[in-house]
């Protein structure tokens, strides 16, 4: 069989794994790349390559070797200038090289949103040294949030509540940085009512949206998500307006995870990822088309006739608590048995080869067909608590 398309996937984590499954169901041939062998997406891909995405020569060599129809980034730390070179030669970078460059760096996408598009954001400043960060914190005020301009899954992110905490926050940010840009963004803390992810799909036929996803974070990383999340119709429309403005400015086709803070009637842009979002894993059970299906269809130019919600749904993460390369996952059978009637449960184990504290090793999914979002959240959390990692 001749594949419908060849995809070079740059980054092979759990989000990439689900994307590979969706793309292969549509006939694509996928080459999964990452810095270590046996990464989750590699286990289900057609081929695999192991190299650092920050090695420009190795990245170019992989592109030259496989000659993909689409280059699909799944991680933040990539030599984006190499992607721009190949896009200029006629290759398709998803969603576009410009979008990848802008969104892989928090400062650049913030400038697009705040300066170019005039969208509401928190007050912010940048710092490249400890002294600059002390000055930025003094000007922004405390409490404030410090994030590396390039990182993932909340790494390096912390809340500074007083001037005494600045030095430790700088060290933590530097330790959590990806890439080679030693720069942080210092944001005024917003006492928001809640935060959401609006999955926004840019297709050749226009922009479509999933229902807003609520989520809870710890240490800057998602712990649980749910869909739908209660919002006023006005707030939903404002989030859609902002999301469409940003993705249309970035261009290209694919799914974007657009994050917002909501405070009263105010909808405030936070961040954007040009790919499936971790909080969007709830769509594996909540929708007829998951975020991974939607990303694959948008990339391949396939139609998305409708996005249907099955009912109140939730996801909860399964985390490791120590470093190990020899471990087992127990309790999956117990996790799949609901404690209440009317609940559907599922589990995704990511098959990562090693653990470390707080590393995401799996996720539980719950659908409350005749219940509430709170019922789904409780079921997902209860299921996650039953899955245990046993270290040998």
Protein language model regions, located:
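Active-site nucleotide/adenylate-binding loops and adjacent lid/helix of ATP-dependent enzymes
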Residues: 9, 102-197, 201-246, 384
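Protein kinase-like catalytic core scaffold
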Residues: 208, 256, 267-271
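Anion (oxyanion) recognition and catalysis
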Residues: 24, 87, 114, 138, ...
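ATP-binding N-terminal substructure of ATP-dependent carboxylate-amine bond-forming enzymes
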Residues: 1-104, 131, 391
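Peripheral (often C-terminal) accessory segments that flank ATP-dependent C-N-forming ligase machineries
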Residues: 297-392
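Active-site "cap" helix and flanking loop/linker of ATP-utilizing ligase/carboxylase catalytic domains
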Residues: 237-258, 263, 273-325
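Short acidic-glycine loop/turn motifs at beta-strand connectors
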Residues: 202-206, 218, 262-266, 368-370
């Amino acid at each position: 069989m001749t594949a419908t398309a060849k995809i070079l996937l740059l980054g092979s984590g759990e989000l990439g794994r689900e994307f590979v499954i969706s793309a292969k169901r549509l006939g694509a041939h996928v080459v999964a790349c990452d810095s270590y062998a046996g990464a989750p997406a590699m286990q289900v891909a057609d081929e695999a390559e192991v190299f650092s995405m920050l090695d420009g020569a190795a990245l170019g060599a992989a592109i030259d070797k496989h000659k993909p129809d689409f280059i699909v980034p799944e991680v933040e730390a990539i030599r984006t200038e190499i992607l721009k070179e190949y896009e200029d030669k006629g290759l398709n970078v998803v969603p576009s090289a410009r979008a990848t460059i802008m969104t892989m760096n928090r400062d650049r996408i913030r400038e697009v949103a705040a300066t170019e598009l005039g969208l509401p954001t928190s007050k912010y400043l940048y710092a490249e040294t400890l002294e600059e960060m002390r000055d930025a914190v003094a000007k922004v005020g405390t409490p404030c949030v410090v994030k590396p301009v390039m990182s993932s899954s909340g790494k390096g992110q912390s809340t500074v509540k007083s001037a005494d905490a600045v030095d430790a926050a700088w060290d933590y940010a530097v330790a959590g940085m990806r890439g080679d840009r030693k720069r942080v963004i210092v944001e005024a803390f917003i006492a928001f009512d809640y935060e959401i992810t609006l999955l926004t799909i840019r297709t050749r036929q226009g922009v479509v949206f999933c229902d807003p996803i609520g989520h809870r974070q710890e240490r800057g990383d998602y712990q649980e998500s749910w869909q739908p999340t209660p919002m006023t119709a006005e707030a939903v429309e404002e989030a859609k307006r902002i999301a469409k403005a940003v993705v249309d400015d970035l261009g290209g086709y694919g799914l974007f995870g657009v994050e917002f803070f909501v405070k009263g009637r105010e909808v405030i842009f936070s961040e954007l990822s040009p790919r499936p979002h971790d909080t969007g894993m709830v769509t594996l059970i909540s929708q007829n088309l998951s975020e991974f299906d939607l990303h694959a269809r948008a990339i391949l130019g396939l139609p998305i006739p409708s996005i249907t919600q099955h009912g109140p749904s939730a996801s909860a993460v399964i985390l490791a608590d120590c470093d190990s390369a020899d471990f087992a996952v127990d309790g999956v059978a117990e996790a799949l048995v609901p404690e209440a009637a009317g609940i559907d449960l599922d589990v995704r184990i990511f098959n990562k080869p090693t653990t470390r504290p707080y590393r995401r090793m799996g996720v539980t999914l719950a659908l409350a067909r005749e219940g509430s979002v709170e019922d789904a959240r409780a079921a997902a959390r209860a299921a996650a608590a039953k899955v245990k990692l046993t270290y040998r």
